[in-house]
Each structure stands twice: as structure tokens, then as C-alpha cells.
Amino acid sequence: MTEHLPTSQVSFDENALIAERRAKLLALRAQGVAYPNDVKREHYAADVQVAFANVETWTAEALEASGDRVRMAGRLMAKRLMGKASFAQIQDESGRIQLLIQSNVLGEDSYAAFKVLDVGDIIAVEGGLTRTRTGELSVKVNVLRLLTKALRPLPDKWHGLTDVEQRYRQRYVDLIVTPESREIFIKRSKIIRALRTWLDARLFLEVETPMMHYIPGGAAAKPFVTYHNALDLELYLRVAPELYLKRLVVGGLERVYEINRNFRNEGVSTRHNPEFTMLELYEAYSTYHEVMDLAETMIRDTAQSVLGTTQVIWDGAQIDLGPIFRRWRMDEAVCHHNPEISVAECTDRDALLLHCERLKIKVKSSYGWGRLLLSIFEATVEHTLIQPTFITDHPVEISPLARESDIEPGYTDRFELFINGKEIANGFSELNDPEEQAMRFQKQVEAKEGGDDEAMYYDADYIRALEYGMAPTGGLGIGVDRLVMLLTGSTSIRDVLLFPYMRPER
């Protein structure tokens, strides 16, 4: 079907088109029918297409003889004028369907009104069904009403919304003209629903914890600061819900989870947005080994539920979520990719400093061996982890809330899940020793005073909660946006956020 659309966004005077459409709206206002709101839709495009899909059964003659009628509404996406008979296409949330519009069926006045409609207008139609000579199912329209006049023209069919920044800024237009974008966000909704269903079936309790914190804690990140006028109090948008969720475990809610927004005052990239969605859960009487099992099974089951497969392609890489995820100690992974580094050197600060210098990795003088080991891991190992891999046993220095290993002092019972070189999840056996936690908080305070903006604050109330006793607990955080990227094959986090952060338009 040929669309009556300009051939290029830059080849027409948009202001002139808008002025022309405003004139049409003015005429509608004069008639008192500019924005009617008394239409009842009974059918959707996709349902009609499926119900009458069999071409051999539902011939044009059979359709017209059946007497079936539809009442539909949607956006006019294409029109082709052909004298006394014309074709058009409308789009609703389910898909598109063709319209056959004939002056002798619709009536001369209504047909004339149809001819001056613009692509982008929202209309309601009623009629029977037929099939064209090419076999396309069509609504034979005998009632047509304009519901909403579109004042701005849509991008044309051939060039579409090619400006990526415009797609993000004007997501409402992107969703109209880009079916692939619409499908991503439908899948996002299904993914989050599948995660909830999975956890609810295992008797996890969904909870809501504060979005504004007196003390920003639960993650090493720089917070956004706000102010409560009535309380005369500085508050912080939360960087993580962790410390509040663990307070609930102290209170006896032994399996809790939250899917909500976190805010971190940091940079923007294809993997980072200052506002993002996290799934965080805690289970009493669980270790990090069991939490790894949980994370692996939940991600695999979610993929199977939403996609019908455990195999996905992400940024050109074929990812298989079906096999057991690899588990690899951080120090062993570093030594494997850097044969010059011995396992003994992984806890030797001076040796690691020399290796960082050799590898041209920039580090700060305040870094201990734990941060140095992490720096080497991030520079030489992380990007190589294509298939799902749990990196385990992180240094205490970079894990202030994780339980220290009983076997290897200086390391923790912690893991991070990497897929295609990107961190998807983080979890550990929780530190439930209040005195040890207080000592680690104090070290974080010293780091902050030394210029580390991402170091944690000292949370005295959380220490008080731990002093009442928290059961041995395992915790997990999954970046929902990155999981959606994985399961939709999206290469930028902005492609899976309806309204990603952008600098204001000038």
C-alpha cells in the first residue's frame, strides 16, 4: 500500500503541514465535534486477523456472507485514494488492519471527510469483512468517525525515526512508528511479571521500602541529594534498598524482595542510567551458593517463560542460558588471563601495583590489594566473560556488606554474574556480625573523608538492627534493565527504558 506521506523528514516544511492541520481542527471545532469521547471499541486488529486468517475458508464471498461486523478504533497509518474507492490502514495496540472505503458504502459526505484525513489521525470504524484480490483481509467500512486530529505529521515510512536521540526524547513517536521498540517494552513488562510470578510461587514477600533515605547506604555510589522543607532535613534518593530489606529480615520476614527504582549520581553510558530498576531479594538461612542457584534458575526460567527459549543473541554473541553457569573465583580468573600474576601475588599490594603499572591500569594510591585486584579483573577479564559466569569470592575491601570467608581471610562469600562482559547480578552471604559491620562502616567513613565519593556512610540504626540478631542470610540484586537488554538483544540501556535520561533540549 502506498502511503500519502512526504518522502523525507527534511524535504517538507513541517510548519506548513502543522498549520494546515490546525486549520482542519479549527473547522472541526466550529462544528462542535473536535474531540468526541463516546466511542466503544469492540474488536482489535490482531484478534480479527487471527480469527479470519484461513484464506481458503474465509474467502471474500464467505466473509461477506457471514454477516460478521467489527467495530474498531486506532491510528490512521496509511491511505491511498483511488477515485470512488480507497484503501487505508489503521493501527491499534495489537497490530494493523486494512480498510476498504467506498463512497457508495460510506456515503458521499463521509467519503469526502475521509479524503481530507491525515496520516496520524485517530479514527473509529465499523463495517463487515472482505478480502481483496491480493488476499488481504479488510474491513469494508460503512461508518467512520474522526476521534482525534493529529496536528504533527509522523515520520515517513521509508526514513522512519532515524535520529536515535529523537527516538529517546520522543518515545511517543517511536512507539507509533517503530514496531520493534514497542515489542521491546511489551517484553520488558512480561519479564518483570515473570520475575514476580517466580518469586511469589516460592513464597517470597514483595515489599516496598523508602525511596528517600536519611543515610544513603547499601551500595558504593554517589547519591542524589534533596531537601525536605517541613522537616528542615537533607535527604538522599536511595542508591539501594539493601539495608532496609535486611532490617525486615531482622524483623522476621525471612523471604523478601523488591522491584523498584534506584538512583545514582553517576555518568551515563550504554550500560548506565542515573535512574534504573533493580530486583533485590533476601532469604534467611541461605548461603551465597544457594543464592547463585536461585539466580541461575530464575533467569533461565524467565527466559523460557517470556521467549520460549534459553538461547539469545546479545550484541552479536550467541548466549545459552540453558547449561549450568560457570563459577570462577576472582583471583583464579585474574591469574588465568594474566599468567604473569601468581595466586600468592593476588593479596600482595606491592606486587599488584607493579602489575597495574605494567598493564597501564590507572589506580589510586589509596587502593589496597582488594581494589587493585578488582582493577586488574575489570581491565583484563570482565570483557571476556561471554557465557554466563559467576565470579566469586571477592576481597573484603570491595565488599563492605558481605560476610568474610571462613576459609580464606580477606575474601568474602560473594558473587557477581557476568554475561557477554556485563554485570547482571550481585549477591553474597550477608554480614550479620554487628561489630564487624560497624568496623567496616568506619573504614568506609575514613575512605569518604579521604575523597572517595562512593564510599558508604555509617548507618547507626542498621547496626542497632543487627544487634537484635539477623539470621544467616543470602542476598541478591539483579539489574532489571540489563536483564531486559539480554533477553531482548538490546545493545543500549536507553533502548529498554521508556524515557531514558537526556540533557534538556535547547
UniProtKB/Swiss-Prot annotation:
One of its GO terms (biological process) is lysyl-tRNA aminoacylation. Binds 3 Mg(2+) ions per subunit. Mg(2+) 2 binds at residue 423. It catalyses: tRNA(Lys) + L-lysine + ATP = L-lysyl-tRNA(Lys) + AMP + diphosphate. It comes from the Bacteria. It is found in: Cytoplasm. Mg(2+) 1 binds at residues 416, 423. Pfam families: tRNA-synt_2 (PF00152), tRNA_anti-codon (PF01336). GO terms for molecular function: ATP binding; lysine-tRNA ligase activity; magnesium ion binding; tRNA binding. Its EC number is 6.1.1.6. Belongs to the class-II aminoacyl-tRNA synthetase family. This is Lysine--tRNA ligase. It comes from Xylella fastidiosa (strain 9a5c). The lineage of its organism: Bacteria, Pseudomonadati, Pseudomonadota, Gammaproteobacteria, Lysobacterales.
